[in-house]
Each structure stands twice: as structure tokens, then as C-alpha cells.
Amino acid sequence: MKITPAQIDLWRQSQSETQNLEFKEAKNQFDTKRLFKYCVAIANEGGGHILLGVADKTPRQIVGTQAFPNIMGITSGIFNAVGFRVDVTEVAHPDGRVIIFSVPPRPLGTAHH
């Protein structure tokens, strides 16, 4: 699935964050260990998305993020830390840079730690 600014705007309209959708402001940076924990938790809840560069309080403005300038580096870092692949997409939204972590669901009968 190609993630577009329009898709981000649809997600922003959500009334609240869910087990499968997290918004994080992360204007300048985001703790990698915290990111790994979010990836594991979302995988265990059936998969979903983490968006960096979007305020988590409504109206969920795009604030942009400078976190993880090396997308390939964080992609491999996540795999090495948690043992499964997370797709990382950088979107140039008109209001700022947004990074989306698309977390797959864990295989049935297993749990990630």
C-alpha cells in the first residue's frame, strides 16, 4: 500500500489513538528502544501503524519530524532488534515530513517480546 498525504489526513481524523494506530510528535528525535517496544506491542495487537511527525492530541496537526534521517538504517535496526520486518515510509506531507512505521501482525499462536 502506497501511503500518501491523503491517507495520513484520513488517519488524523480518527477520534482517538487505538491499539493499531499511534501518533507521535517526535519533532527532533524519537527513542529507538521506545520505537522497538511500540512495534512489538502493535504486532501483538494485530498490526498497525506508528506515525512520527503528527501531534497525538486532536486536531492532530502535522508538526514534521527530523527523527531517523536514515530510513534504511532504522529499518534494519528494527529488524535486528525485534526480529521481524517493519516497512518504513517517509512522506513529504505539505505540512511537514512524516515517517510511517507499518507493523505487520504477529503470526498466529505466537507473541513477540
Residue ranges and their predicted role:
Residues M1-H113:
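Conserved N-terminal catalytic/coupling substructures associated with nucleotide/phosphate chemistry
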